[in-house]
């Protein structure tokens, strides 16, 4: 297979892969994931406990709660370790502080992780939009190389140079498309982690009743 044929085959596969997913689960043309785009979560999607009091929104003013939220929200911390931190924190509280403090923990986790998730979703849309721009540019490059090769007086060295450039750009495009597949899972991973952490908070409250 010639360099140009290889580049064109890569380009066709990559562009088709991008086009297959783009907007698959939403009307947003910049959304490339098969997962449905939900820019923001609602508290009710992850929390089955009692209604949180208005004071829970002040969670960031409490240093201990804020530090716990920061720790358990980090995906680098294994889920089991994060759940243990929540249980240990609840166990350290006086009985009269358990409900208000854990409500703040829940509100804090929701605010922090929902914001992180929304940030990831925005990044995915920007990334996908750039992919569409790159795909259009690659199609133009391939067309230009075809036109150059069709010229009777085409410089073979120039054809080879332009073809190598197209090959390289197409590989970059394909690698980015493959990376996007993994990134698309991140919003769901964050949502599932938040749900499990919320369940742990609910269990600490139920245990003290």
Protein language model features and the residues they cover:
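Bacterial N-terminal signal peptides that target proteins for export
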Residues: 1-10
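Bacterial N-terminal signal peptides
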Residues: 9-19
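N-terminal Sec/ER secretory leader and immediately downstream segment
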Residues: 24-99
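Short, charge-rich amphipathic alpha-helices with coiled-coil/heptad character
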Residues: 93-122
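Heptad-repeat alpha-helical rod positions in long coiled-coil/spectrin-like domains
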Residues: 118, 125, 129, 136, ...
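Non-transmembrane amphipathic alpha-helical segments
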Residues: 120, 127, 131-149
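Short E/K-rich amphipathic alpha-helical oligomerization segments
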Residues: 140-168
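Alpha-helical oligomerization segments
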Residues: 157-209
């Amino acid at each position: 297979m010639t360099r140009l044929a290889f580049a064109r085959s890569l380009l066709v596969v990559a562009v088709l892969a991008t086009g297959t997913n783009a907007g698959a689960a939403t009307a947003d043309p910049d959304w490339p994931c098969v997962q449905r785009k939900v820019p923001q979560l609602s508290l009710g999607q992850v929390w089955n406990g009692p209604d949180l009091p208005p004071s829970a929104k002040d969670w960031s003013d409490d240093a201990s709660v804020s530090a716990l939220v920061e720790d358990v929200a980090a995906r680098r911390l294994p889920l089991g370790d994060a759940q243990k931190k929540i249980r240990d924190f609840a166990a350290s509280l006086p009985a009269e502080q358990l409900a208000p403090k854990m409500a703040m923990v829940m509100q804090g986790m929701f605010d922090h992780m929902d914001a992180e998730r929304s940030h990831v979703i925005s990044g995915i849309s920007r990334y996908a939009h750039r992919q569409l721009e790159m795909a259009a540019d690659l199609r133009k490059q391939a067309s230009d190389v075809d036109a150059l090769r069709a010229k009777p007086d085409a410089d073979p060295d120039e054809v080879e140079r332009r073809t190598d450039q197209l090959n390289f750009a197409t590989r970059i495009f394909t690698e980015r498309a493959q990376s996007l597949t993994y990134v698309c899972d991140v919003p769901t991973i964050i949502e599932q982690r938040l749900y499990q952490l919320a369940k742990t908070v609910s269990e600490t409250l139920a245990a003290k009743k």
